[in-house]
């Protein structure tokens, strides 16, 4: 049986479900068979949406180029762990998601943040000062120096606090970084975070108003 909070949440999110629910309620007691049909239809749509939300979704930019090899490996790592991190049944913190993904990412050559201790933080240089000393650096969740690839894993703050924009800006400033992966939840509270982030980057590339240094951006919805 579907949890009650999922039913309420998806009825609020989906116009189709709201329509079905209103039709079912408006029929009243005089036609229980039709009322039951409408609610069964609504619940089946809830089930379909929930199953889709449990899948890994991804979108690669620019859309006129195929996904690069490193991105393809990153996708496989996320796919192999989706049963433990999908945001519908496992609404866990981003650090916990990263911990689950760490073995797979490390096996593919990434250095992954383990904790907030200085020795465990992954820093990527931005500016160099006197005698070549790093003057400014940004932290990343994972970094592959040879592939020039940065990964940022977000949870609830991805869209709510525009954390994905901060990730994008910092990746553009980092030295020796050509590729960025931003992983966000498919669903957070009543927000389709992955869809909203995709819409932003669709607009960014379609408008062609901002020229950035990244060769590829991979968006992941988990």
How would you describe each model-predicted region?
Residues 87-91, 104-146, 159-166, 173:
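Active-site metal-binding core of divalent-cation-utilizing nuclease and nuclease-like domains
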Residues 2-3, 7-9, 13-15, 40:
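N-terminal amphipathic/hydrophobic targeting modules at extreme N-termini
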Residues 34-35:
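Polybasic, lysine-rich low-complexity intrinsically disordered segments
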Residues 186-222:
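Domain-level recognition of nuclease-like catalytic cores that cleave nucleotide substrates
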Residues 152-167, 190-193:
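Active-site-adjacent loop/helix micro-motif of nuclease/hydrolase catalytic cores
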Residues 21-24, 31, 42:
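Short hydrophobic alpha-helical segments enriched in small aliphatic residues
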Residues 40-126:
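Interdomain/boundary linker segments immediately adjacent to catalytic/signaling cores
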């Amino acid at each position: 049986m579907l949890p009650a909070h999922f039913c309420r949440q998806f009825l609020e999110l989906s116009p189709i479900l709201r329509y079905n629910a209103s039709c079912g309620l408006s029929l009243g007691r005089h036609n229980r068979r039709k009322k039951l049909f409408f609610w069964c239809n609504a619940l089946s749509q809830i089930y379909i949406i929930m199953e889709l939300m449990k899948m890994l979704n991804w979108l690669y930019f620019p859309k006129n180029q195929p996904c690069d090899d490193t991105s393809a490996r990153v996708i496989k790592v996320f796919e192999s762990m989706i049963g433990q991190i999908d945001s519908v049944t496992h609404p866990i913190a981003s650090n916990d998601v990263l911990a689950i993904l760490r073995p797979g990412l490390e096996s593919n050559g990434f250095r992954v943040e383990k904790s907030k201790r200085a020795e465990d933080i992954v820093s990527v240089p931005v500016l160099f000062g006197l005698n070549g000393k790093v003057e400014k650096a940004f932290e990343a969740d994972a970094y592959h120096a040879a592939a020039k690839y940065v990964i940022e894993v977000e949870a609830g703050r991805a869209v709510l606090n525009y954390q994905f924009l901060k990730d994008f800006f910092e990746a553009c400033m980092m030295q020796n970084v050509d590729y960025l992966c931003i992983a966000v939840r498919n669903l957070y509270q009543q927000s389709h975070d992955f869809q909203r982030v995709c819409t932003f980057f669709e607009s960014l590339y379609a408008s062609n108003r901002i020229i950035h240094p990244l060769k590829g951006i991979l968006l992941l919805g988990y």
